[in-house]
Amino acid sequence: MKNYLTLDVGGSAIKYALIQEDLSIIEKSSVPTPMDNLENFIETICQIYDQFQNQIEGIAISMPGIIDPERGYQYTGGALRYITNLDTVQILQERCPTNITIGNDAKCAANAEIGFGNLQDIQDGAVVILGTGIGGCLIKDHKVHTGKHFSAGEFSFIKTNNQDALSWNHAWSTRCGIQGLLERVQEQLESDQKYSGIEIFEMANQGDEKVIAGINAFAKEVATQIFNVHIIFDCEKIAIGGGISAQPLLIDLIKENLNEIYAHLGFDVYHPEIVPCRFRNDANLIGALYQHLQTFKSQD
């Protein structure tokens, strides 16, 4: 069984794992993400490679930013501001002589679902990741749809209010990231007390009606934009990911609000199935591996 080093580069940590082709995770750990400069970032990746170089067939990397996965080229690096117009794979291969692939993090999460998860049986669909912002990906003909400029599915930028279209206040990422959820609950509780996502769902699952109302207000806005994505793209399924997607209450409320939209539409349209992502915290690692395997399978 072949082993692969997979990395999920985030704004605070680089998670890495030694994974076999059958998705067995042999070892997993993390290191802080260098935020100061490119040199330290490259050196950190290479130090991880040094630990496993004699055990692996290649490196698969998930990263933020706008990425051309075929060239291994990054136009932007998301929170990693020192990455701009960078031949990332070429630079890494100078120090790590092995097969290397990189992909956008949300698109890697989608690849995990296409290859091994809850979107294996579709041709067209979407993935919505509810996190700090909104991660997104469109799936066309059973493949991630990158778009001409590799930025298709950047749902974070969707505007939700034309009265304030020039600021981020009503971007989908602001309204429906985790902070947006916390604010809806605080509004219902009429409290300035800060709660975590875990605490909110514990309170909701114990029957706190005000908390449930806050979650429902959040779910209604998520459902509205999911409806818009579907009407534009005609999805068979839409998978919802991110840590809070593990909460059945949230998925149920999103479905209920979507059904209400359909009921008042006045036209018959296909209702895509709404499913949680199978892979949660490991989605980017698994999806990066799927992209890597597909890349070198096509080159054989």
Regions found by a protein language model. Name each.
Residues 24-25, 74, 144-145:
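Hydrophobic "anchor" residues
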Residues 120-173:
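Glycine-rich phosphate-binding loop of actin/hexokinase-like ATP-binding domains
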Residues 1-58, 67-71, 92-98, 115-122, ...:
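ATP-binding/phosphotransfer module of carbohydrate and carboxylate kinases, centering on a glycine-rich
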Residues 29-31, 78, 148:
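Short hydrophobic alpha-helix segments
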Residues 20, 63, 140-141:
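A cytosolic small-molecule/anion-sensing beta-strand core signal
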Residues 100-106:
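General beta-strand structural signal in soluble alpha/beta enzymes
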Residues 32-34, 82, 151-154:
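A short acidic/small-residue loop/turn micro-motif
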Residues 73-85:
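A charged helix-plus-loop insertion that forms the helical arch/lid used to bind
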